[in-house]
Amino acid sequence: MAASGTSATFRASVSSAPSSSSQLTHLKSPFKAVKYTPLPSSRSKSSSFSVSCTIAKDPPVLMAAGSDPALWQRPDSFGRFGKFGGKYVPETLMHALSELESAFYALATDDDFQRELAGILKDYVGRESPLYFAERLTEHYRRENGEGPLIYLKREDLNHTGAHKINNAVAQALLAKRLGKKRIIAETGAGQHGVATATVCARFGLECIIYMGAQDMERQALNVFRMRLLGAEVRGVHSGTATLKDATSEAIRDWVTNVETTHYILGSVAGPHPYPMMVRDFHAVIGKETRKQALEKWGGKPDVLVACVGGGSNAMGLFHEFVNDTEVRMIGVEAAGFGLDSGKHAATLTKGDVGVLHGAMSYLLQDDDGQIIEPHSISAGLDYPGVGPEHSFFKDMGRAEYYSITDEEALEAFKRVSRLEGIIPALETSHALAYLEKLCPTLSDGTRVVLNFSGRGDKDVQTVAKYLDV
């Protein structure tokens, strides 16, 4: 696989210089009050969790499709996508975030960094990942008159470690080395980001601590073993719901306490600026390759993009390249759990309200008092009560569509795709695959659908075996 410009480099999507922390910490919000979910208290005696709001003075202006790409694709200098995003963090972290932002901009034009990243993505990660025509899945959705859409799978499951997560982990590990940080922390839900982070830490000789909810550790025991085998310390989190939200909170506590020596490799397009922008740009290789491969295969663009959405990194990696191609539909699929009316789901964009969690304003699952509602999904990677702020922005602007799939529907897709294509999907990916059952009957003949096959399902086989009779 040849390294190409599409698969080996990233470029920062914001051209303006980062704002100083003094500018970022004293702004008052002009918007009506939103629900604020505070972070848990720090264990550091010297640190306090104050709220730093970075919302600008003017509310966002609604944008028409096809408008200025800078408005569609870039956060502003405060790290906002419309009213979403920002930096709601303790003062302790402001310098670290500003330092990270400055380094990100600098490395975007650093040829040595780009060459090193390109080499690792090609030779270690195994990019570029194939755009695979799913012949039997396509046949499954063919109607009686012989018409139907054409299904292509962007095979991120074939990356080293078995998911898209390695794209971001490699790049952030290289960035941490440039910052002189030798201690790495990360949160994980399904374990794929934890495995990817442990992998790159082993590769670069960095200390690695992974925070993981105790409930997730039980259902993802294989990935826990893999992380420990790779030399990572996996710390179980028993507070709250003992899932991804709580693991993220614990990782932030650690970062506040050890900010001078530690880099936090956040695994999704969530959290305070610059993480949503930075993680998106490190995953944008997915969409760049897809554009190139589509041109090679059929001489055009995809008609429809489909990806699962928890925090939203794999979806944003695919979507970002096509945001300004307004004829390309972008569809995100959330976890409906036991059903949207059951109260046991993780459909943040479908059922959530605007609030603040883990350093950013976005849609959240919360009650009338602003307290987080416990999410549920059979998929540990989608079991999160928030979502990346850019997804919230796309929802409000109408640029992307968001739907939800139940546990039962995802399990059926898990089995169906395994038997039709000989590829065992992750439970996260199975949610996107399940949505094809609803989408494909509505599509015209020859519509080209690209689905981001975000991860393989080895990690989920034990969980699925409890539910499926095979």
UniProtKB/Swiss-Prot annotation:
This is Tryptophan synthase beta chain 1, chloroplastic. It holds the Pfam family PALP. Its cofactor is pyridoxal 5'-phosphate. It comes from Arabidopsis thaliana. Residues 1-10 have a biased composition (Polar residues). GO terms for biological process: indoleacetic acid biosynthetic process; response to oxidative stress. It catalyses: (1S,2R)-1-C-(indol-3-yl)glycerol 3-phosphate + L-serine = D-glyceraldehyde 3-phosphate + L-tryptophan + H2O. The gene is TSB1. The lineage of its organism: Eukaryota, Viridiplantae, Streptophyta, Embryophyta, Tracheophyta. Pathway: Amino-acid biosynthesis; L-tryptophan biosynthesis; L-tryptophan from chorismate: step 5/5.
